[in-house]
Design a protein with these regions (language model features):
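N-terminal Rossmann-like FAD-binding beta1-loop-alpha1 element of flavoenzymes
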Residues: 2-28
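Short hydrophobic core segments
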Residues: 5-7, 188-199, 336
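Active-site substrate-recognition segment that forms the wall
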Residues: 15-22, 33, 44, 84-85, ...
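Short beta-strand to alpha-helix junction loop
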Residues: 60-64, 96-101, 143-159, 266-270, ...
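Helix-loop-beta segment of a Rossmann-like dinucleotide-binding subdomain
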Residues: 82-95, 110-111, 117-159, 256-260, ...
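A conserved short coil-to-beta-strand element within the FAD-binding core of flavoproteins
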Residues: 149, 167-183
Length: 367
């Protein structure tokens, strides 16, 4: 049995654990500290098709990441897992300058040829939008795609770990290279996946690496409403907050994008209040909702906002990914799957050369 360790049980680590657990010749152990994980505090909208980012490699990963959910859902269903973390209920895109909607509509039509998952597309007026999301206002027109989905990140990770039945060790660990293998805690592993998001530098800097990954704080607030919102589309206005409705009257509002806060996990009521006030202009019903709690997580960004994955330069059998930013629930599962493929030396659909780890993880001194 080959021993494989995964450090970090967010969306990337949990997906890798799930796919590796299917291999009978591997013994997989997951280590997770459990503090500040971005996945648990993620708003969770899967709708990359309206992005105007010029980074073609990023868009390809995000597009394939949205498509990959279809495979992941099918695989989990075969494993006998509940698919209660994902719902394709559509997405509403709002723009302050509504003349831009036509251009985005045309872009999405063109992209639908390679991404049929986008589903039905249309520019809706307020009356039509209110048939799908009663009470939404503050716009004349919006763009709708029926294929937009929402994901409960924390629940997805729970389901992946349940299905994988791997050993989960809840502690903060470090990585020590030995002449053969790597020591983590009390054990030695032949291969290691580092899926610690913004904390990647904490593992690699002691080994003489420079890691171009910075933390960004995100906060969101959950509300409870009287009406069931299971079939409501997610709402993406211009700006940093989104409205994400769930079954059972749960509604999430978020998330903030706070730079220069390091790994701070305190709730900032002022920022959450500002977000709520901005959201009230679009959804006044929010004033009647009860706040049911806040979530805070730390996203990982590289200096050029690109994600990366691959083998850590100079550490044979150690693979890492980071820099997923605010699209981690879209790109996380497909990256986790690819890390699992790399461990097994299997075929990849995305070429790591387009997401080169050596641009972001550099050895500056040998131990």
């Amino acid at each position: 049995m080959k021993k494989v360790a995964i450090i970090g049980a967010g969306i990337v680590g949990a997906t890798a654990a799930y796919y590796l657990s299917k291999e009978s010749d591997l013994e997989v152990t997951v280590f997770d500290h459990g503090q500040g994980q971005a996945t648990k505090a993620a708003a969770g909208i899967i709708s990359p098709w309206f992005s105007k980012r010029r980074n073609k490699a990023w868009y390809k990963m995000a597009r394939l990441g949205a498509d990959f959910y279809v495979d992941l859902l099918a695989d989990l269903e075969k494993s006998g897992q509940e698919i209660d973390f994902y719902q394709r209920s559509g997405v509403f895109l709002l723009k302050k300058d509504e003349t831009k909607l036509e251009e985005l509509y045309q872009l999405a039509l063109q992209r639908r040829e390679e991404s049929p998952l986008i589903g039905q597309l249309g520019i809706l007026d307020q009356a039509s939008a209110n048939e799908l999301f009663p009470g939404l206002q503050g716009f004349d027109y919006l763009l709708y795609a029926s294929g937009g989905a929402r994901v409960d990140g924390q629940l997805l990770v729970t389901r992946l770990l349940e299905a994988s039945q791997v050993k989960l060790v809840k502690e903060k660990v470090s990585l020590t290279p030995l002449s053969s293998g790597y020591q983590i805690g009390e054990e030695v592993f032949e291969q290691v996946i580092l899926a610690t998001g913004a904390w990647l530098g904490h593992l690699l800097e002691p080994l003489g690496y420079e890691v171009d990954v910075r933390p960004q704080k995100g906060q969101l607030r959950d509300y409870q409403l009287a009406q069931d919102m299971e079939s409501y589309p997610v709402v993406m206005p211009e700006g940093e907050w989104d409205l994400i409705p769930f079954a059972g009257g749960k509604l999430s509002l978020g998330a903030t994008h706070e730079n220069d806060m390091g790994f701070d996990l305190t709730v900032d009521d002022t920022l959450l209040q500002q977000m709520e006030e901005a959201a009230l202009t679009h959804y006044p019903t929010l004033a009647e909702a009860k706040s049911s709690g806040e979530r805070v997580g730390i996203r990982a960004y590289t200096s050029d906002f690109s994600p990366f994955f691959g083998q850590v330069p100079g550490l044979r059998g150690v693979y890492a990914a980071s820099g997923l930013g605010s699209s981690g629930l879209t790109t996380g599962p497909i990256i986790g799957y690819h890390l699992a493929q790399l461990v097994q030396d299997k075929k990849l659909t995305m070429d790591p050369l387009n997401y080169p780890i050596e641009n972001y993880v550099k050895r500056v001194k040998s131990e």
